[in-house]
């Protein structure tokens, strides 16, 4: 498998391939990362790894997102591995997602506004805290390893994933309806949703209201079919629970929360 060493950005969130991640970068250790990434030619990938935190605390104070919930740039200059224990890799889930920063804009106060998109899953092999920011050696994690090992088995897995994808989309529409208290005509239509099973699996995993450990479990599923199968069970369970709860605000698949870091 292909390995690489990339900057590491820990979060109390899970990034999935194909999903957009807005970031407000305040801490010096992550500002240093963005300054270096910003020197990369805009036509070249500006890659870093987003990994969910298992233990320790997030790379920044997150609070409520109000102005005083984040530090003033330059006043929170912690060491790269500070807050993550003597062996930082133990604080992180071992499967993360490579992000490609399409936009890196430095503000007048030295903080950064970043817009990145998840690309591929990777497995953490090691973490280095000796530089100005964390880096990790990672290896690519194939989405459907069976397809690489055996053509016939891979085709069978793809057919299973396609069938599961249809069921997941139906269950997701029902989940949307219950979650939003919406009418059928206000739901996202099939034309608005992708037909690629792996894309469906990541979109649903990102959009569903689930905790970080559950989202992490979906990210590191061994293949698309396994992820879709688990999502189908989760959606059915969550929809049944929501039936007994008051209406909740509609979820918006086109927006993602901005993570202050």
Please provide the spans of the model-predicted regions:
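N-terminal low-complexity, acidic/polar interaction/targeting segments
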Residues: 1-261
